[in-house]
Swiss-Prot record:
One of its GO terms (biological process) is translation. GO terms for molecular function: small ribosomal subunit rRNA binding; structural constituent of ribosome. Keywords: Ribonucleoprotein, Ribosomal protein, RNA-binding, rRNA-binding. One of its GO terms (cellular component) is cytosol. The gene is rpsT. Binds directly to 16S ribosomal RNA. This is Small ribosomal subunit protein bS20. It comes from the Bacteria. Belongs to the bacterial ribosomal protein bS20 family. InterPro entries: Ribosomal_bS20 (IPR002583), Ribosomal_bS20_sf (IPR036510).
């Protein structure tokens, strides 16, 4: 454990940030799973609405620098491609 006052504060702030980041990353994983589940279920309309939510969540996480912006862009691109294929099929 830290001994200096500033190090104690830094540790406390890190714990709070970690909790916040974990919550956001969990949400990101869950919305991606929701899109994939809708695609597997064959429901293109549900997949499209889930994609809108996923896009919003991924962009917000990237804006807050919780995930890298290129990771967010890659995930959105791949999910969009999959949803578009499901709609056209």
């Amino acid at each position: 454990m830290a001994n200096h006052k500033s190090a104690i504060k830094r540790h406390r702030q890190n714990l709070l940030a970690r909790a916040r980041n974990r919550a956001v990353k969990t949400r990101v994983r869950n919305v991606i799973k929701a899109v994939r589940a809708a695609l597997i279920g064959g429901d293109a309309a549900a997949a499209e609405t889930a994609l809108l939510t996923a896009t919003k969540v991924l962009d917000k996480a990237a804006t807050k620098k919780i995930i890298h912006w290129k990771t967010a862009a890659r995930n959105i691109s791949r999910l969009s491609t999959a949803v578009n294929k499901a709609k056209s099929a």
